[in-house]
Every structure is written in C-alpha cells, then in structure tokens.
C-alpha cells in the first residue's frame, strides 16, 4: 500500500501548546496567558501553558524527535505576541524572529519542509482588548502581521496556513465562550467572528498574492476543522437533510466563500434569516458580505487544509422554542453511535475521513488537500506501549490510501497531531496526543517515543503501509 511518490508525512504542534516561555525575552501576553492565569476551573486543574513542553528553550530536543520520525514536513505555529508583543508592527521582538529563524533553518538543513501557521488561537491580548475577532479593526491588524511574517520568513517558508481552525475559533471563543475571552454570545458572536476571520484570511491571501508570490512562489490557505456527519436514520429524509445542513453550517460556511464564490451557503443564510425574524431581530444575525467583499474573498486559497478527528450522527431537531445558538439555527442534534470506541470526545471512526475527503473533492472542484491535523488522544497516565492507539492510526492510513486510490482524492500531505504531548486547551495536560511522551513533572521535560512514534517512522520510511487492502 504505497502512497504516491513525494507524499508528505508530517507532525504538527502549535506555539501556545508547546513553547512555554510565556513572558520570556520580551514576549507579550496572549489571550491564553490571560485566560489560564485567571483560573476559575475553565481549564483542567487550572493548568496553564506557561512552561508547557518548554519548546522555546528545548527546540533541539524537538528536532531530535522530528529526525527520529523521519518526517518530510513539520507544521508549527508562530506566536503572534512573541514576534509583535502588542500585536502591531510598532515594536518588533528580534528574539522572537531569532527563535523561529532557527527552527526554519534547522528544518531545512535536515531536509524537512516547514508548514507554518500564522495564528493558532493565541491572539495578542492587546488586540483582544480592542474587541478581538468581534471587531472589524482586527482585519487590518492580521493583514499587517501576515505581511510581516511573509517578508521575514517567506524566503524559506513556502507553505502557509493563515488561521488555524477558523470555524472552531469563532464558535468556541465568541459564541460558546469556552475559549478566551470566555464570554458567550450565543447565536451572534460566532457569526460576527466568522465574518471577520474570513475577511482577514482573504486580505492576507491577497497581500501574499500581490506582494510576495512572484518572488517566493509559496502557497497560502487556512485550515478548517471537520467532523464527518452521517444521518442518524439513513432512511429518514429529515435526518438526511439535517446531516447535509450540519456539514454546511460547520465546514461550508467558511469553505464556500473562500473556495467557490465569496458568499455563505444559501441554506445557512435562509435558516439564520428565518430564525432571526422569528426571534424579533430587525435583520439576520448572520452579517452580509458586500459585492465588493465577495469578489475579494472568492478563490483565496491555494490548497484545502482540513483537520479530521471524528464522526457523529445527526438528527433533525426542530427549534420550536426559537432558542439562540448555532445548532439551533441549523436545527440539528448530534451524538455518537454507541458502538464506537472513544477516548474523551474522539470517537474512533476511520471511515469518516474517507467520506470527508470525497465530499471535499466533489464539493470544491478536486483541490489539492492537506490533512493538517489528525490524531487520537490517550488519557493521562498514558502507556508508552500504545498499541491500541496505533491500530487507530493504521486504520486511518488504510482509509487515506483508499481515498487516494479509489476516489482519486488529491491528498498530498498528512500531519499527525501531535509531535508531542502538550497543553490541550481546556483539557490541559490530561489528554495526551503526542507521538512522543512528555513528562510534565520533570523540569527537563524529557521526550520519549510511544510505540506509535516507532510505527509511524516505519510508515514514513516505506511511504505507506506494508499490508494490502
């Protein structure tokens, strides 16, 4: 089961989740610094990313892990407030530039291609104080930051992700309030943030296109989180429609404007407009793009970056009471099949990724696809011999092989989440996704490979699985 020649085998991390050094060498505070320092049990045991894996000082150790796996690509993110402590180019932190230059140069020296994320949930606190993603002012701030990164690192970085999981960020931070700033705005904040995230991404893509592409010859996209969604009752028309609506609300709401035509899907617009009207709003809670903005947004991605972890069943749930919220707007309820195995929120459904990839191929004109995250957690304490978890990975690779061979999906890169056990947002250090175990009790933060790391290294060496379908 050999994958296509030149297939990219990667692992991923993100700045706040691994770096630590939260106030080292002139770094400014980000929203997760503020949020975790406030306590209040919003994060498991009030844990913080102040030290995390210590990657800010232990990059050499991370590099050893990368070399041990034989990765072809490594995806990491830049800390916006490490580079620009107040979020603006008014003051530039040279120590931050030096740190990322070293990572990029070391990767290239070792034949590893960097995939760099500009922004992975860790907004500079100064910009959150000015309204964050609910304010239109952020679009310009993000564009300036993106241009700064393109001009500083783009001579060597050719694969960029502007915004990580924009669809998760908008909902978790600004609708449900489970991520910083921690203030819920049910049924309004998520859409407002989505609107600004889409425009910020598009602006930065155009900046790359007009100012840097000719010389640097790179590619720019954003990454979107996607759960595959199946009708709970495959014979029920209302469940079938609900499953389609669910995918549209959570993936296409971002992907359709960017990849197809600059505007939100019709069903999203009509559902939210009709709910808003019933609730007595003077206009839809979903903001509208101007014709000018639609032109600006359309076609602003050079590849499709998707992050798949799990699948859910969907059934139709009429919003009789007119409650506010995104699920209520979509009129859906989601839940797992009781027969699926799970660790925490991740139910193991490897076939879901095959269906998702086919959906992206068919809906978005057969784009080049990167899976920029996929993985399985272990609960703490996690055994180093994680054979059960490796089995989930193996089944996933079989499904990817099928998608490439049978469905002719143009999948070019796979990133395992994550290189290291790390700070998993609200779950703190209780959920371990690493290919390498990190001992968070030991100040030296030693990295030790799980069985999965050794097995993944074999897959990379063979460019695929040894067994046949």
UniProtKB/Swiss-Prot annotation:
Any one of the GO CC terms: membrane
Binding annotation for substrate: 17, 120, 164, 309, 417, 424-425
Tissue expression summary: Present in small intestine (at protein level). Expressed in liver, small intestine, colon, spleen and kidney. Down-regulated in renal cell carcinomas and hepatocellular carcinomas.
The keyword Endoplasmic reticulum is assigned to this record: no
Activity regulation annotation text: Inhibited by 2,4-dinitrophenyl-2-fluoro-2-deoxy-beta-D-glucopyranoside. Inhibited by sodium taurocholate. Inhibited by alpha-1-C-nonyl-DIX/AnDIX. The glucosylceramidase activity is slightly inhibited by conduritol B epoxide/CBE while the galactosylceramidase activity is not.
Family matches, as Pfam families: Glyco_hydro_1 (PF00232)
pH dependence: Optimum pH is 6.0-7.0 for the glucosylceramidase activity. Optimum pH is 6.0 for the hydrolysis of 4-methylumbelliferyl-beta-D-glucopyranoside. Activity decreases sharply with increasing acidity and is less than 4% at pH 4.
Domain of life: Eukaryota
Keyword Chaperone: no
Documented EC number(s): 3.2.1.21, 3.2.1.46, 3.2.1.45
Keywords assigned: Cytoplasm, Glycosidase, Hydrolase, Lipid metabolism
Posttranslational modification: The N-terminus is blocked.
Protein name per Swiss-Prot or TrEMBL: Cytosolic beta-glucosidase
């Amino acid at each position: 089961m050999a994958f296509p020649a030149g297939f990219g085998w990667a692992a991923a991390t993100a700045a706040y989740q691994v770096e630590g050094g939260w106030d080292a060498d002139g770094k400014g505070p980000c929203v997760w610094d503020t949020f975790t320092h406030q306590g209040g049990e919003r994060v498991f045991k009030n844990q913080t990313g102040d030290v995390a894996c210590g990657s800010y000082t232990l990059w050499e150790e991370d590099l050893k892990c990368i070399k041990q796996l034989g990765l072809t690509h490594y995806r990491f993110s830049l800390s916006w407030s490490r580079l620009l402590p107040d979020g603006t180019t008014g003051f530039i932190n040279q120590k931050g530039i030096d740190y990322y230059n070293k990572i990029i140069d070391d990767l290239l020296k070792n034949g590893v291609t960097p995939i760099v994320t500009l922004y992975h949930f860790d907004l500079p606190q100064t910009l959150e104080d000015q309204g964050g993603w609910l304010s239109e002012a952020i679009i310009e701030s993000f564009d300036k930051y993106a241009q700064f990164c393109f001009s500083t690192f783009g001579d060597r970085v050719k694969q960029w992700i502007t915004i990580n999981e924009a669809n998760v960020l908008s909902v978790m931070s600004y609708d449900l309030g489970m991520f910083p700033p921690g203030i819920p705005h049910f049924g309004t904040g998520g859409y407002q943030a989505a609107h600004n995230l889409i425009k910020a991404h598009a602006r930065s893509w155009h900046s790359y296109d007009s100012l840097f592409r000719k010389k640097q010859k790179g590619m720019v996209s954003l990454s979107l989180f996607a759960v595959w969604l199946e009708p709970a009752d495959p014979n029920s028309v209302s469940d079938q429609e609900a499953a389609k609506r669910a995918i549209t609300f959570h993936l296409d709401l971002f992907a359709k404007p960017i990849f197809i035509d600059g505007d939100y899907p019709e069903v999203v617009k009509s559902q939210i407009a009709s709910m808003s009207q019933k609730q007595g709003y003077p206009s839809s809670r979903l903001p509208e793009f101007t014709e000018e903005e639609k032109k600006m947004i359309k076609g602003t991605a050079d590849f499709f970056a998707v992050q798949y972890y799990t699948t859910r069943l969907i059934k139709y749930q009429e919003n009789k009471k007119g409650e506010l919220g995104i699920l209520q707007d979509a009129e859906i309820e989601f839940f797992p099949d009781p027969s699926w195995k799970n660790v925490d929120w991740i139910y193991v459904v490897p076939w879901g990724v095959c269906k998702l990839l086919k959906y992206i191929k068919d809906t978005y004109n057969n784009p080049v696809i990167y899976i920029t995250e996929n993985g399985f957690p272990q609960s703490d304490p996690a055994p180093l011999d994680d054979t059960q978890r490796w089995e989930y990975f193996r089944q996933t690779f079989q499904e990817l092989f099928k998608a490439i061979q049978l469905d002719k999906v143009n999948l070019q890169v796979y990133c395992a989440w994550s290189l290291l056990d790390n700070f998993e947002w609200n779950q703190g250090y209780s959920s371990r996704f690493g290919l390498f175990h990190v001992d968070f009790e030991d100040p030296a933060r030693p990295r030790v490979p799980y069985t999965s790391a050794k097995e993944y290294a074999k897959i990379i060496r063979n460019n695929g699985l040894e067994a046949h379908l």
